[in-house]
Amino acid sequence: MVSETRYATSGEVSIAYRVAGEGPFDIVFVPGSGSHVELAWDLPVPLRAWYERFASFARVIHFDKRGTGMSDAVSPATILETRMDDVRAVMDAAGSERAAVIGLSEGGPMSALFAATYPDRAWALVLWGAMAKETRTADYPWGTDEAETLQAIASIRANLATRPQRLEEAAREACPGGTEEEIKALATLFRNAMSPGAAADLARMNLAIDVRDVLPAIRIPTLVLHNTHDPWVEVGNGRYLGEHISGATYVELPEQGHIPSAATAGPSLDAMEQFLRRAWGAGAWEESEPDRVLATVLFTDIVGSSEHATALGDREWRKTLEQHHELVRRQLVRFRGREVDSWRRLLRQLRRAGTRNSLRVRDLRGGRRARCRTRGGCSG
């Protein structure tokens, strides 16, 4: 039984989700860009076999990432940390305290970031056809070519406007083993997942994906699966994840395609179910104090403080300091951080989109401006 579509609120964005199945634990499914929570269950799309299998032994929470499917549109400037926090918002709305998180494709790095950021909310991680970094660099040769991707982004609108069959071609590329019924259903899902403009915006945002630095902070049971002949996400991406997440189990399947058809999904689904049941049985779900925490440490100080204090005098300088303190406190509340060591040292777990490292304190009445210098860094 699948619930009606519901909405979680993440900041000011509404995130569509559905819940299905029952079981001793929850699974949160984080899809790729081709997502639509209603069509995914109502049409014979290839991944429907996944949802039905997961719902046979667990409670499944499936959502559309912001900018896709039935969720709100997204600003092209939205960073991965903000998008990642949608997972937490959906879990809260669905009443899920802890869950196994399954990330598909570009939902994978979001899931990995969530697991590192919220070790108290995720007890297991499964990554399918995922990547640690989107673009290719000398130290990461498996990513996409940025110039080619930008060229493809520029032609998205024209391609979808003049070649509607392109979506069916994309469905065949993604799922070469699919039946005609599955291919047509998948093309329909792609068509309803995003408008051409939204697809271009999401592709631009994905160019910034790089979670390599957070992988060592993942300390929960992790399974990484990848098809050897994945045409969309080169297999080196999966191998990298398997090598750089501590204790991860890596399973490489000698298959074609990015998405398995219902007929070929058996081995991967068996591996995922066995992994989750085993991790659950071993007590991975039990809460424990994490030995590593992913956090951002932010230091602030007012540039030229001595000169400002002299120029303003004690009373006005105290007002400026109070304005600085209030501004910083508001940012901490906004991003769920906490204050450490008076006003100079601020610590927050990476719970939301990172606080921009440019806070300014203004003396509006006197027309003066004191700049606030910040220094930040991640600690894991």
Residue map of PLM features:
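Conserved HGGG/HGGXW glycine-rich cap/lid loop of the alpha/beta-hydrolase fold
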Residues: 7-70
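Conserved acidic catalytic loop of the alpha/beta-hydrolase fold
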Residues: 81-99
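Flexible "cap/lid" loop of the alpha/beta hydrolase fold
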Residues: 112, 116, 122-158
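Conserved alpha/beta-hydrolase catalytic His-Asp/Glu region
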Residues: 159-205, 214-215
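Short beta-strand/loop motif that positions the catalytic acidic residue
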Residues: 218, 224-226
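Conserved alpha/beta-hydrolase "acid-adjacent" motif
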Residues: 231-237
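Catalytic active-site module of serine/aspartate enzymes centered on a nucleophile-bearing elbow/loop
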Residues: 248-289
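Catalytic NTP-binding/metal-coordinating core of nucleotidyl cyclase/transferase enzymes
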Residues: 285-366, 375
